[in-house]
């Protein structure tokens, strides 16, 4: 009797174990189906194809809610413009970052580095450009009298191109404390100059919102 009871107990446990180890099979037929899953270390393209993703490594946490902008100097130091406390952080090539300066503004929406190592940081919604020296001391370089400054670029002659909003104007600032009137490069009649970039020939390109234009100067 005990032998029979033991046999049936083992048999029941076997079937429970077998049932629990059965593989689950499902199929997906669209990108939206794939996106319902948790993508780990893979990329999903517009057609739903899954490929290995580049390895991502966290090197520094600013403890700020936003990182709005970044720039790299000749030595490989990375400067991060953040919000909403208006702080700029410096991360050397080794990755041990630290606070570079606190601008006492809301957002640092653009950062650029000049050839001499000076860092320029633009703020929003107060529309100012600060020059920051190697010690982290910041002074107002240009007051655009605009609500937003979205973009900066250092021109070949060292002047600073400044892209603004909400009036969509581009300024070229050649010296500290220059006025907006004397620095106006172009009024696009669009709302915002979201991005500025230079090519190897020194031509300036501007990308706008809300008409999505690309302008060359």
Question: Where do the protein language model's features map onto the residues?
Answer:
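Short loop/turn segments that connect beta-strands within beta-propeller blades
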Residues: 91-96, 132-137, 173-179, 217
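Conserved beta-strand position repeated once per blade in WD40 beta-propeller domains
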Residues: 68-69, 109-110, 151, 195
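A short loop-to-beta-strand structural motif that recurs across blades of beta-propeller domains
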Residues: 87-90, 127-131, 169-172, 213-216
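Surface loop/turn motifs at the tips and blade-to-blade linkers of beta-strand repeat domains
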Residues: 59-63, 100-104, 141-145, 185-189
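Conserved beta-propeller blade signature
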Residues: 77-80, 118-121, 159-162, 203-206
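Short loop/turn segments immediately following the C-termini of beta-strands
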Residues: 83, 124, 165-167, 209
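Residue-level detector of Asp-centered blade-edge/turn motifs that repeat once per structural unit
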Residues: 72-75, 113-116, 154-157, 198-201
């Amino acid at each position: 009797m005990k032998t029979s009871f033991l046999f049936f107990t083992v048999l029941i446990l076997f079937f429970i174990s077998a049932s629990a180890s059965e593989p689950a099979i499902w199929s997906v037929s669209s990108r939206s189906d794939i996106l319902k899953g948790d993508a780990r270390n893979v990329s999903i393209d517009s057609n739903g194809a899954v490929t290995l993703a580049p390895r991502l490594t966290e090197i520094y946490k600013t403890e700020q809610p936003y990182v709005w902008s970044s720039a790299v100097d000749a030595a490989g130091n990375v400067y991060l413009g953040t919000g909403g406390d208006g702080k700029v952080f410096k991360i050397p090539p080794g990755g041990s970052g630290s606070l570079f300066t606190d601008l006492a503004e809301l957002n640092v929406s653009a950062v650029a580095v000049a050839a001499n190592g000076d860092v320029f940081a633009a703020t929003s919604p107060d529309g100012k450009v600060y020059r920051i020296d190697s010690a982290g001391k910041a002074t107002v370089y240009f007051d655009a009298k605009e609500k937003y400054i979205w973009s900066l670029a250092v021109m070949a002659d060292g002047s600073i191109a400044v892209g603004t909003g909400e009036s969509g104007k581009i300024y070229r600032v050649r010296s500290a404390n220059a006025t907006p009137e004397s620095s106006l490069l172009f009024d696009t009649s669009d709302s915002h100059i979201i991005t500025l970039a230079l090519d190897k020939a020194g031509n300036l390109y501007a990308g706008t919102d809300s008409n999505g234009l690309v302008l060359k100067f």
